[in-house]
């Protein structure tokens, strides 16, 4: 993409206050099931139908009062996925990459995290998401996609 470049986490954290940080997470679980009783499934991946009709990963903008990227991401997960997100937290060890947009406004750094959960945790998130604070506002539904 034009105007987007990969940067290190330390570079991202050194950017000034004119930059906004957004964090998103791929939440997945090994899936021992079989599709139609025959085709082995490998993983279930939690995605959401966003307000604009696109599929995406849960997360959002980090607020200055969050204190860290991970605190902001965990807050966003709780808002979007509901109380089931309180059963786990993402930390710096789950971080994978950062990408910055070069053209203002706004100047945004997108951070991506990956976390393996249990299948029970993924199913609990999927079931509880309609009761989440932001369900219906920022997101339309939660989907557990399999065979990835």
Language model feature labels by segment:
Residues 1-148:
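N-terminal leader/linker segments that precede catalytic domains of diphosphate-processing enzymes
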């Amino acid at each position: 993409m034009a105007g987007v470049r990969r940067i290190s986490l330390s570079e991202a954290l050194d950017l000034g206050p004119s930059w906004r940080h957004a964090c998103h997470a791929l939440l997945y679980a090994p899936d021992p099931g079989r599709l139609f009783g025959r085709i082995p499934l490998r993983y279930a991946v939690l995605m959401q139908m966003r307000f604009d009709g696109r599929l995406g990963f849960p997360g959002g903008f980090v607020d200055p009062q969050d204190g860290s990227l991970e605190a902001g991401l965990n807050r966003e997960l709780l808002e979007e996925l509901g109380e089931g997100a309180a059963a786990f937290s993402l930390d710096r060890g789950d971080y994978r990459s950062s990408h910055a947009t070069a053209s203002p406004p706004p100047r945004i750094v997108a951070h991506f995290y990956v976390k393996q959960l249990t299948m029970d945790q993924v199913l609990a998130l999927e079931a509880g998401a309609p009761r989440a604070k932001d369900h219906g506002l920022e997101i339309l539904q939660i989907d557990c996609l399999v065979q990835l």
